[in-house]
Amino acid sequence: MKDVGQLIRTKVYDRLFGVLEYNGQNIPVYDSAGVPANAAQPYVLLSTFNSTELLEGSKQSYGQELSLLIEVCMKFDNSFGGKLICDNISNQITELIRTRQAGYLDLSPDWYIIRTLLESTNTLEQPVSTGVLTRRLIRFTFKIQQQ
């Protein structure tokens, strides 16, 4: 069995990078280990990743269910704001990732996606020393099969 973590994160990154925008400005996309301290706001973060082997495989192939959390982050210097901007960017992400079968991420030659689901989405507001950080959390689940 192969580890598909890096592949799925790369494919999601490639799908989002250079495509997301708000008010005519591109929205940067970062992996969880690479957000610069002075990152432009808002930005998208590919966050936690989980994988579970499915017992539905065969002698020739393996199945996995993967979960990837994507965060839309926006900091405001006052006590409120950011929800509408995060909602707009979240909608763009959902339209790009949660597609019909013809638009699924291409994981070939080793894997293919059986199903993509929007597992959950919610908004968090965190007070920080200089204002409020609004985070829109979007979790997608992918059921995949090794070819």
Question: Residues of each region from the PLM?
Answer:
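Oligomerization/assembly interface segments of phage tail-like spikes and tubes
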Residues: 62-78, 132-144
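Short, solvent-exposed beta-strand/turn "edge" segments of beta-rich domains on protein surfaces
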Residues: 56-63, 127-131
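Extracellular/virion structural assembly segments
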Residues: 61-62, 73-100
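Acidic-leaning, charged glycine-interspersed low-complexity segments
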Residues: 41-44, 94-145
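Charge-dense, low-complexity intrinsically disordered segments
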Residues: 2-3, 80, 84, 127
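Small/polar-rich, solvent-exposed N-terminal microdomains that initiate assembly or binding
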Residues: 1-60, 100-109
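Short, cysteine-centered beta-strand-loop-beta hairpins and adjacent loop/turn segments enriched
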Residues: 52-56, 75-81, 145-147
